[in-house]
């Protein structure tokens, strides 16, 4: 019966493709077994892939066919519950087994009727990402179904939440007298409608006995010798990497001048890390990575900046598998600005571990101590500030590393006083700000809110109330993940227990603006940009406070010593723009009175992986290209900008004219600017500019405008285009960093993406992608 239903669905999709004019690509299905039908689907999709460049209807139909293939590979509920490979935890399995009929009636049947059709028609990339990556591969080539996938996540969180007094009643739509199934249905629906998109480790491992569920791990082993650093790397770092977590590790304390007996210092440790990452990723479908944090006064700074790509000086110490981030004090930019204003002989001094106290300081305390150490002659060498700046920019542009973060902004706007015990680094993707030390890791559990699901139809508008409810649900969901999660080592468990840090981000900001008819950097879009951030921070903090006030839970450890307990809110450190009349004063008083269950709330991460299942733009970034192309082992994978394709179909009722426009776009790498020249501000296609065509200053300013309400940080990538002669404007990149510094941002540069002048379809400056934090 199930095979016949799927066969009929395939037949209906094939008929639609024929009606769209693609009969010559198709042989009608005559398959008599599931295996034959799966092979048939694979053949048809392979034939039609190239056509998706011109017809979004084919792209969506191919996605539906892949969903049929997923259904052909799926197993019964009984087989799924008892699968040794899936290995559900006993609590989750028992919770589902005891309510199977109730779950089927109240959750699964409504999903298949109401939500699944929209999910199945999102597109080819979405379907393939679920099939290849997120759905658990079971015995004999079988696959977890989408019903089972969403149920695993929702049931795991529900099982934890219903055991917390009164917490479930904080979920929108849940009242006193609720049942386990009521709560599970809310989470299931939020996941199935893609309102909440959990991080990759959560989707892969939550509810299972195997795998760790956190995305980001921050470490500072405080290693002052190579031996101690090696022990830290082969211990905790290796353990986390094998659990597929991404690592940000501060190695600033390993700051030795080379001697006869110790000639390589930090370089040798970086090489060990590089080899470890390469080995762990060599047989893994989900690669992870490491970002090493040092401050720009480290004695090995210039050597570290020559360990990747074409800048490598010594092949023995090539480290192309890891990244570096400069944890940069304000003093560096103050000196560079002094140089720009005409000051002569502006120097930057490098120190060894005799100046280790600088690692623990920030702000004025750092500056005064740095100046004193310079006067005392403890510097190892001095370099013209412009030479250091150029070396940093050249390395970022050519190799994609270093990233750059602002040490003082991160510490100044942290919820604890860190003077004398400063935060020393961030995570792999530069959006998490937590204190780590030799005894405790910083750990963050991530999820993003898909902004496109907050759009109301006819006429299209952004529903702030919907965002508010989703933000509240996400807080409860992630706290359930924290309670149920697996973590790879004791120091990670300690970090989770003490801080209960959440990292709630967004995805689909550009797509949302497109559907509203806004250019991403237009005034209406910039206003919405701030409203989204403010409402999310307010609602997440309010929900966390109510977990203490209404739910009776204890605040996070250290709350009484935190700035929160004294009435501080993150936006107090900024010149805040607000477009919403929210009762912040009342919330401030309530936090002082009742506390916060969680210590942190918002972190705007890249959503490279999960944005593929939602078919929307990544994070808060502009769309990179209106026709994304990726070559894989199975061939070229195309992902068109469906909003542009839909708009072209609406604009051109004549198919011949529409195809003519698409051919023009094809010849110009799908750039509307290159294809059609100077478009008027009111032209409907102007808003389809890509990341490299936006003024980067506007994108930095948008990050700055929402920064007061982002209590962690934002993975801000810069998109730079080569000049026609193939040169990269280093001053352009440096000016953007200065702009970010002056705006008080915490992250100045995640990736620096360079588009080649010779081929506008190519990127450079960082080909590796983090899928740990990238959701």
UniProtKB/Swiss-Prot annotation:
General function of this protein: Ribonucleoside-diphosphate reductase holoenzyme provides the precursors necessary for viral DNA synthesis. Allows virus growth in non-dividing cells, as well as reactivation from latency in infected hosts. Catalyzes the biosynthesis of deoxyribonucleotides from the corresponding ribonucleotides.
Protein name per the record: Ribonucleoside-diphosphate reductase large subunit
Family: Belongs to the ribonucleoside diphosphate reductase large chain family.
SUPFAM superfamilies linked to this entry: PFL-like glycyl radical enzymes
Gene3D superfamilies with a match to the protein in the record: 3.20.70.20
Binding site residues for substrate: 200, 215-216, 246, 427-431, 606-610
GO molecular function: ATP binding; ribonucleoside-diphosphate reductase activity, thioredoxin disulfide as acceptor
E.C. no: 1.17.4.1
InterPro entries linked to this entry: HSV_RIR1, NrdE_NrdA_C, RNR_lg_C, RNR_lsu_N, Rrm1
Catalytic activity: a 2'-deoxyribonucleoside 5'-diphosphate + [thioredoxin]-disulfide + H2O = a ribonucleoside 5'-diphosphate + [thioredoxin]-dithiol
């Amino acid at each position: 019966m199930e095979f016949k239903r799927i066969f009929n669905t395939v037949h209906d999709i094939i008929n639609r493709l024929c009606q769209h004019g693609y009969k010559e690509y198709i042989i009608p299905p005559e398959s008599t077994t599931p295996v034959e039908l799966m092979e048939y689907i694979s053949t048809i999709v392979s034939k039609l892939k190239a056509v998706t460049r011109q017809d979004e209807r084919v792209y969506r139909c191919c996605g539906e066919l892949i969903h049929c293939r997923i259904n052909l590979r799926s197993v019964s509920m009984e087989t799924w519950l008892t699968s040794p490979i899936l290995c559900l935890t006993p609590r989750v399995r028992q919770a589902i087994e005891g309510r199977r009929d109730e779950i089927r009636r109240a959750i699964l049947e409504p999903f298949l009727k109401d939500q699944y059709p929209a999910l199945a028609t999102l597109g080819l990339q979405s379907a393939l990402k679920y099939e290849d990556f997120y759905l658990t591969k079971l015995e004999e080539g079988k696959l977890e179904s989408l019903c089972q996938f969403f149920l695993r996540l929702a049931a795991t969180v529900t099982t934890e939440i219903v055991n917390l007094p009164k917490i479930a009643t904080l979920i929108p739509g849940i009242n006193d007298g609720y049942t386990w199934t009521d709560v599970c249905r809310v989470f299931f629906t939020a996941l199935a409608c893609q309102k909440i998109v959990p991080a990759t480790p959560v989707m892969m491992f939550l509810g299972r006995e195997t795998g760790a569920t956190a995305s980001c791990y921050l470490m500072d082993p405080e290693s002052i010798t190579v031996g101690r650093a090696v022990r830290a790397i082969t211990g905790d770092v290796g353990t986390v990497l094998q659990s597929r977590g991404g690592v940000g590790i501060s190695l600033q304390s390993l700051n030795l001048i080379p001697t006869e007996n110790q000639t390589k210092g930090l370089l040798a440790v970086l090489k060990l890390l590089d080899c470890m990452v390469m080995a762990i990723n060599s047989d893994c479908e989900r690669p992870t990575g490491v970002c090493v944090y040092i401050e720009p006064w480290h004695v090995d700074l210039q050597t570290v900046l020559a360990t990747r790509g074409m800048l490598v000086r010594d092949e023995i110490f090539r480290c192309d598998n890891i990244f570096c981030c400069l944890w940069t004090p304000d003093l560096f930019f103050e000196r560079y600005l002094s140089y720009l204003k005409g000051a002569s002989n502006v120097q930057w001094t490098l120190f060894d571990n005799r100046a280790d106290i600088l690692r623990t300081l920030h702000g004025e305390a750092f500056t005064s101590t740095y100046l004193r150490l310079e006067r005392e002659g403890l510097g190892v060498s001095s370099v013209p500030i412009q030479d250091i700046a150029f070396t940093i920019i050249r390395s970022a542009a050519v190799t994609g590393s270093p990233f750059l973060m602002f040490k003082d902004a991160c510490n100044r706007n942290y919820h604890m006083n860190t003077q004398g015990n400063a935060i020393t680094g961030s995570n792999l993707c530069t959006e998490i700000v937590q204190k780590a030390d030799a005894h405790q890791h910083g750990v963050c559990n991530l999820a993003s809110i898909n902004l496109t699901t907050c759009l109301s139809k006819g006429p299209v508008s952004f529903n702030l109330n919907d965002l508010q409810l989703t933000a509240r649900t996400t807080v409860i969901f992630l706290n359930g993940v924290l309670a149920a999660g697996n973590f790879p080592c004791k120091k990670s468990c300690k970090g989770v227990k003490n801080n209960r840090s959440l990292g709630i981000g967004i995805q689909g900001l550009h797509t949302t603006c497109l559907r509203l008819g806004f250019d991403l950097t237009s005034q209406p879009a910039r206003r919405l940009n701030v409203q989204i951030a403010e409402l999310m921070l307010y609602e997440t903090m309010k929900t966390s406070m109510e977990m203490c006030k209404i739910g009776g839970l204890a605040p996070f450890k250290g709350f009484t010593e935190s700035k929160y307990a004294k009435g501080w809110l993150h936006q107090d450190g900024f010149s805040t723009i607000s477009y919403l009349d929210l009762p912040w004063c009342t919330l401030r008083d309530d936090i002082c009175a009742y506390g916060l269950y969680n210590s942190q709330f918002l972190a705007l991460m890249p959503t490279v992986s999960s944005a593929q299942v939602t078919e929307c733009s990544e994070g808060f970034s502009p769309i990179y290209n209106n026709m994304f192309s990726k070559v894989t082992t199975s061939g070229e994978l195309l992902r068109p900008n469906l909003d542009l394709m839909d708009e072209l179909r609406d604009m051109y009722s004549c198919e011949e004219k529409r195809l003519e426009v698409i051919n023009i776009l094809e010849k110009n790498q799908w750039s509307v600017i290159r294809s059609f020249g100077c478009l008027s501000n009111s032209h409907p296609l102007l808003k389809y500019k890509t990341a490299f065509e936006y003024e980067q200053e506007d994108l930095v300013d948008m990050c700055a405008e929402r920064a007061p309400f982002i209590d962690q940080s934002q993975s801000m990538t810069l998109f730079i285009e080569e000049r026609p002669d193939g040169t990269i404007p280093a001053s352009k990149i440096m000016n953007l960093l200065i702009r970010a510094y002056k705006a008080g941002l915490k992250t100045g540069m995640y990736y620096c993406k360079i588009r080649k002048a010779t081929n506008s379809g190519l990127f450079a400056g960082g080909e590796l992608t983090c899928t740990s934090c990238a959701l």
